Each structure stands twice: as structure tokens, then as C-alpha cells.
């Protein structure tokens, strides 16, 4: 079994698995117009990903954490050796966005494992909410997530 985490603002919990945010704004591994859900291998990486995307403002308000589980056979693994040059730069490159877009177009798996930029020894996953196997992903009831005050009171 594969597991992952997603942390979202409580106000967005109902739409946390639609892929709409990524579809509207794009991301490192998808361009605007392609709906995907970003999740992280560990809850700490999910928190760090959220934190870095909110900088320079610290996260405020209520957050919820979801644990996801799915069979590993539903995951395609993108090989690090195939990463384009500058895959981890900011802003994200067209080449990395095309990786996710092409994966969605092919439709071979519901999950794509990609290396984390913030921690290259860990993985993030793209989930395709429109894939027929999306219903095979078990999503936990949300639990409250609190950012440590040492991170947000700086």
C-alpha cells in the first residue's frame, strides 16, 4: 500500500480532491487547464509544501490534514534520470509541466510519483481526479492540522 498526505485550509476541504486549484493556477508538474491533486509522501512534507507556497505570509486560520491510501500498482514512478535540466527551479519550467500534462493525457495510472523539490529524498504524487481508479484511493476523515507556532511567529 502507498500512503500520502494532503493539508488544506478548512474552508477548502470540500474541494480538496477536485484538482481545481492546480487546473486554475498550474503547478510544477502541470500547466493551467490540467486538473491534478498534489499530495506528499509524508505529512511533514505536505506541511512544508503548503508553507513554502504561502510565503512570505505565514499560514493562518484552520487547516485539515487528510491521509490517503491506495495500492502501489496504481502508481507510475517518474524516474529521476529522466528529469529535465533545471526541473527544480522557480518558477517551474514548461518541461516539468509537460510531464504531468502528458501523464494525465495518457491516462495509464491514477497516481504519478515525482521527486520532491524541497526534499529530493522524498516523493510527491500527482493524482488524477478524473481517472476511473480515483475511487480506489481511500481518503481519511480530516483531522485538525496545526502549524507549530515556532514556524509561523517569526
Predicted regions and their residues:
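Active-site and NAD+-binding cores of ADP-ribose-processing enzymes
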Residues: 2-18, 31, 59-154
Amino acid at each position: 500500500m502507498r500512503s500520502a498526505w494532503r493539508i488544506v485550509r478548512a474552508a477548502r476541504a470540500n474541494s480538496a480532491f477536485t484538482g481545481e486549484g492546480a487546473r486554475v493556477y498550474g503547478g510544477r508538474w502541470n500547466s493551467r487547464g490540467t486538473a491534478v491533486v498534489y499530495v506528499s509522501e509524508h505529512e511533514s512534507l505536505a506541511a512544508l509544501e503548503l508553507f513554502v507556497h504561502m510565503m512570505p505570509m505565514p499560514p493562518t486560520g484552520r487547516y485539515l490534514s487528510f491521509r490517503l491510501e491506495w495500492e502501489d500498482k496504481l502508481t507510475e514512478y517518474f524516474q529521476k534520470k529522466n528529469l529535465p535540466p533545471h526541473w527544480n527551479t522557480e518558477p517551474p519550467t514548461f518541461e516539468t509541466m509537460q510531464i504531468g500534462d502528458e501523464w494525465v493525457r495518457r491516462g495509464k495510472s491514477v497516481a504519478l510519483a515525482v521527486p520532491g523539490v524541497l526534499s529530493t529524498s522524498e516523493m510527491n504524487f500527482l493524482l488524477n481526479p478524473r481517472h476511473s481508479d480515483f475511487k480506489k484511493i481511500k481518503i481519511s476523515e480530516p483531522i485538525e492540522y496545526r502549524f507549530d507556532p515556532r514556524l509561523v511567529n517569526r
